[in-house]
């Protein structure tokens, strides 16, 4: 962890943690500048776009939430940004991404200043998949916001989302709505739009999830913000809804954020990719790093001659 930058109400550091021996998760750690006894923590994965960790909207949501009292870890999707030890579309990318998210969670919970009862996660598109998958299998995620991804009819357009496969096999079939339902009874906000596979959310996916939450007696823990005139992104109106939900359920500093839903992001300075990179000439990738996906597969004892769809049959 290095290159601490003091910003307006928050700090940004460049960080790499070891997911397993020789495989590194690269990201940025956003912290509140104001000292507190305990902080909420938020995992911030992203979707499919080159260098997306460096984009304005990932920086904006991470910095805003840090300014309001959360430690936020924004990290690269496997095969994107600085995570170049393997291709993204490799057979076990879903496994690697899920494991990476668990390791990010492990790291955040290892910080003595983090409140283990106030852990959130949010991402858009492929980051939304990472959000509802980890929330489904790890009860340590207390509040989740999958954005523009929960769909009853679309598994995800990439091997990292549906390639294992986890949705359909010889003896079962499921979908992402049932995965999202596994968040119950924990607070969950589903954000959807009118221009992608989440267009039916108010009439299809959300009513199903409402029934699941009602069966736990916690209907008030589930919300849907549907933006019918918007497209597939994690834009300002979606971030605004996410901010309010996290502030409410993670008990962030509402005095700074909920004055007439004051979610102004103008205080945030967007940093260049060069200032956010973990590995450079001064801080190169460690010498024990696995160099390619063959080395990764061999280290994890996966056979390298099988089709990706045959890895998980036995």
Pin down the residues of each PLM region.
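Short beta-strand-to-loop junctions in surface cap/lid or active-site-entrance loops
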Residues: 16-20, 27-38
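Cap/lid segment of the alpha/beta-hydrolase catalytic domain
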Residues: 33-113, 150-165
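Loop/turn elements at helix/coil->beta-strand transitions in domains of secreted/extracellular proteins
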Residues: 38-40, 68-71, 115-118, 139-143, ...
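Generic beta-strand/beta-sheet core signal
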Residues: 30, 45, 75, 122-124, ...
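The feature captures the conserved acid-bearing segment of alpha/beta-hydrolase catalytic domains
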Residues: 143, 155-214
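Alpha-helix capping and helix-loop boundary segments enriched in small/acidic/polar residues
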Residues: 49-60, 88-99, 121-132, 163-178, ...
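Primarily recognizes the serine-hydrolase "nucleophile elbow" in alpha/beta-hydrolase
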Residues: 106-172
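Alpha/beta-hydrolase-fold serine-hydrolase catalytic core, especially in secreted/extracellular enzymes
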Residues: 1-24, 184, 191-314
């Amino acid at each position: 962890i290095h290159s601490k930058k003091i910003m307006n109400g928050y700090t940004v550091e460049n960080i790499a943690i070891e997911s397993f021996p020789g495989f590194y998760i690269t990201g940025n750690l956003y912290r509140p500048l104001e000292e507190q006894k305990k902080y909420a923590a938020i995992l911030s994965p992203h979707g499919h776009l080159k260098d997306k960790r460096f984009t304005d909207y990932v920086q904006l949501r991470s910095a805003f939430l840090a300014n309001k009292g959360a430690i936020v870890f924004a990290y690269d999707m496997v095969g994107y940004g600085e995570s170049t030890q393997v291709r993204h579309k490799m057979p076990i990318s879903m496994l690697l991404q899920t494991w990476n998210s668990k390791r990010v969670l492990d790291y955040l919970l290892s910080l003595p200043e983090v409140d283990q009862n106030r852990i959130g996660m949010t991402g858009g598109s492929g980051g939304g998949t990472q959000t509802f998958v980890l929330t489904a299998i790890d009860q340590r995620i207390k509040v989740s916001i999958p954005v523009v991804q929960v769909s009853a009819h679309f598994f995800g357009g990439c091997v990292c989302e549906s390639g294992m496969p986890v949705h359909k096999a010889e003896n079962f079939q499921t979908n992402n709505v049932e995965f999202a339902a596994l968040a119950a009874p924990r607070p969950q906000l589903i954000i959807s739009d009118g221009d992608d596979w989440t267009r039916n959310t108010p009439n299809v996916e959300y009513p199903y999830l409402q029934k699941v939450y009602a069966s736990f007696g916690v209907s008030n823990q589930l919300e849907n913000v549907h933006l019918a005139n918007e497209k597939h992104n994690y834009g300002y109106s979606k971030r605004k809804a996410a901010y309010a939900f996290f502030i409410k359920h993670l008990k962030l500093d509402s005095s700074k954020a909920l004055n007439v839903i004051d979610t102004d992001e103008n205080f945030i300075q967007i940093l260049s990719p060069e200032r956010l990179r973990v590995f450079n000439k001064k801080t190169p990738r460690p010498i024990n790093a696995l160099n390619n996906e063959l080395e990764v597969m061999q280290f994890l004892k996966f056979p390298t001659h099988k089709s990706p769809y045959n890895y998980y049959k036995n």
